[in-house]
């Protein structure tokens, strides 16, 4: 797009403060009082001054890792933010009016996957047991799953497909843009880099010369069970004191966050275990199996009945995704087809970054499915 488009009526952005009981005393000590942005389309003001105006479908925007919902309402150069995009699509009559909700699910580990974890917090419960009822009380929504959907990209896309599986009683349609899938590839390729980053926080520090592998294994027995020997804690403490993270640090904290998401263990030093021995680099099969219990490509069969209740499932991914998610997306589509689950799957010539323009495809599909 060459310049900003302004023809559409902008609607109204409301920012509320929500006090969460679910997130109070969460394991990371993250705030339980959070801002919740809600965008109301121009049609919401029909019958202004009364509560007799139209009730509308609701779409929840689950942002990606390192993001927060309200960030999707920020001004963007050239492209649309999500409220602008929704306003334009409504103005162009490509979709009907809907309320958009932007939850804040950021954590000290950089984000989460919109699931419950004893190491991070109960973010699935936060969404389904607190935010949904709160929004339905405060706004004129069509307050049933048949008129409520969620969409997201990357971690948000993962959250959308997982909620369509495990929490389908709350959602009528979902859109998964480049969501994490096929963990063997999407996460496995990056863990060696994370181990190298964590090695910087090993004590004692590495020195050149002979390396006594048997002695190191005896001294660090916990590593074979995925336990921290102190380097992960030192890594996190160092990052939490920084204003800017390097690319390697950003990827490392992402993988640490995934470990806290997929393999929490209240008995472990940090409340979770790692899937690799940090000294030898060996994958720990018992720990990795816990990760695979959360892989969408392996969950379709288990949740096929729930997925079939959804009125729309949309999945897409760029075929140059730098995290190789397009392979997992293809497998996911294949598994959905094998179980007779209706869905739309598309690919496009792009990578993982700055692909919000794909919402021009997904949002109309969701709105058509959720309209009264």
Q: Residue locations for each model-derived region?
A:
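Non-catalytic cap/lid and distal C-terminal segments of serine-dependent acyl enzymes
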Residues: 1-372
């Amino acid at each position: 797009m060459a310049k900003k488009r302004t023809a559409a009526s902008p609607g109204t952005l409301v920012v509320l403060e929500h006090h969460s009981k679910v997130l109070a005393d969460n394991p990371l000590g993250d705030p339980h009082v959070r801002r919740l942005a809600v965008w109301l389309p121009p049609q919401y003001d029909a019958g202004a001054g009364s509560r007799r105006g139209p009730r509308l479908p609701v779409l929840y925007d689950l942002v990606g890792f390192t993001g927060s919902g309200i960030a999707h309402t920020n001004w963007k150069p050239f492209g649309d933010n999500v409220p602008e995009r929704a306003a334009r699509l409504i103005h162009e009559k490509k979709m009907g009016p809907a309320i958009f909700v932007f939850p804040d699910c950021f954590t000290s580990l950089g984000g989460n996957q919109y699931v419950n974890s004893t190491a991070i917090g109960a973010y699935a419960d936060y969404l389904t047991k607190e935010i949904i009822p709160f929004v339905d009380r405060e706004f004129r929504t069509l307050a049933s799953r048949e008129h409520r959907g969620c969409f997201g990209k990357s971690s948000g896309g993962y959250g959308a497909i997982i909620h369509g599986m495990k929490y389908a009683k709350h959602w009528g349609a979902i859109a998964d843009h480049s969501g994490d899938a096929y963990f063997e590839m999407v996460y496995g390729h990056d863990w060696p880099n994370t181990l190298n980053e964590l090695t910087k926080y090993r004590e004692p520090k590495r020195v050149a010369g002979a390396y006594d592998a048997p002695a190191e294994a005896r001294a660090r027995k916990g590593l074979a069970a995925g336990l921290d020997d102190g380097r992960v804690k030192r890594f996190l403490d160092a990052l939490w004191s920084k204003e800017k993270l390097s690319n390697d640090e950003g990827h490392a904290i992402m993988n640490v966050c995934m470990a806290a998401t997929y393999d929490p263990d209240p008995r472990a030093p940090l409340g979770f275990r790692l899937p690799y021995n940090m000294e030898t680099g060996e994958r720990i099969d018992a720990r990795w199996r816990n990760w695979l219990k959360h892989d969408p490509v392996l969950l379709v069969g288990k949740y096929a009945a729930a997925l079939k209740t959804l009125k729309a499932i949309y999945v897409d991914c760029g075929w140059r995704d730098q995290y190789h998610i397009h392979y997992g997306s293809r497998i996911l589509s294949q598994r959905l087809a094998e179980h007779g689950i209706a869905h739309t799957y598309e690919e496009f010539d792009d990578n993982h970054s700055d692909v919000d323009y794909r919402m021009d495809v997904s949002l109309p599909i969701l709105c058509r499915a959720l309209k009264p």
